[in-house]
Amino acid sequence: MSNDHLETTGSSDPNTNLLKYLPIVLNPDRTITRPIQIPSTAASPDPTSSSPVLTKDLALNPLHNTFVRLFLPRHALYNSAKLPLVVYFHGGGFILFSAASTIFHDFCCEMAVHAGVVIASVDYRLAPEHRLPAAYDDAMEALQWIKDSRDEWLTNFADFSNCFIMGESAGGNIAYHAGLRAAAVADELLPLKIKGLVLDEPGFGGSKRTGSELRLANDSRLPTFVLDLIWELSLPMGADRDHEYCNPTAESEPLYSFDKIRSLGWRVMVVGCHGDPMIDRQMELAERLEKKGVDVVAQFDVGGYHAVKLEDPEKAKQFFVILKKFVVDSCTTKL
């Protein structure tokens, strides 16, 4: 996407309009500056605190400055039964936020309590400094790290035989691609046994506009030019939006086949809303998975907007009910 495209939004300075949607400045060389410090929350592992969820950070790859933030519901300390494990990837268009960002920290705390799960939220490398597939590589490294971890929270309270890969927005894209990769090497991840994927408003795109993208081209949160820029900054240099990282339905078969997910018996939950410009692509992916024989649970709500659950507590609670049922049903399914 060119600077001229950005200027069509009504200003000679493309960043004037861009800052309305993303806290970044686009530099002439197509790098970005993040001028605003996004609120973050420190981990709190103290069991004597009043918090219903304990949290702590563990280094994943010091060379990449990546880490995993664990979320442990306090009630797990007093129960003998282990809880399902959710490996979570935050959103942010591949270019913003971290596992410590307050908006995702708070969401994971609520999810841990209401869904009754242990969460390992992965802090992955961001684009454009680290373009895709860097985040996918970090995701796989996290799964391997969890498999081999001797951390007492994971070994004592997380049920490795009931693991789920989940992500929101760009994180949903990461969860999808990490899931395809993990399915291809499932035996190597044992005793970590994945039961399903949770794709929460997963971020996908394509060169040809869908009906929802056209209908919501001037969306107040994710207008077309912002989505295009996110992909320009995140995809490998020279790739277009029909690259498999962006458009999972562009080719007849992905690099890592759906067939393995089906044969492993994994279930896939796809969640979205019709106020999201990417809803058509999310629905198309769910349909394609179903046609491949994958057990899909799809929930597409009327109205709403992208990332509504991060801002609306009632929407979040409704989602946690659906998520908990998906997790419980998946855990009782024999693979």
UniProtKB/Swiss-Prot annotation:
Keywords: Hydrolase, Serine esterase. InterPro entries: AB_hydrolase_3 (IPR013094), AB_hydrolase_fold (IPR029058), Carboxylest/Gibb_receptor (IPR050466), Lipase_GDXG_HIS_AS (IPR002168). Is inhibited by the organophosphates paraoxon and dimethylchlorophosphate (DMCP). Its EC number is 3.1.1.1. A motif (Involved in the stabilization of the negatively charged intermediate by the formation of the oxyanion hole) lies at residues 90-92. The keyword Zinc does not apply. Carboxylesterase acting on esters with varying acyl chain length. This is Carboxylesterase 1. It comes from Actinidia eriantha.
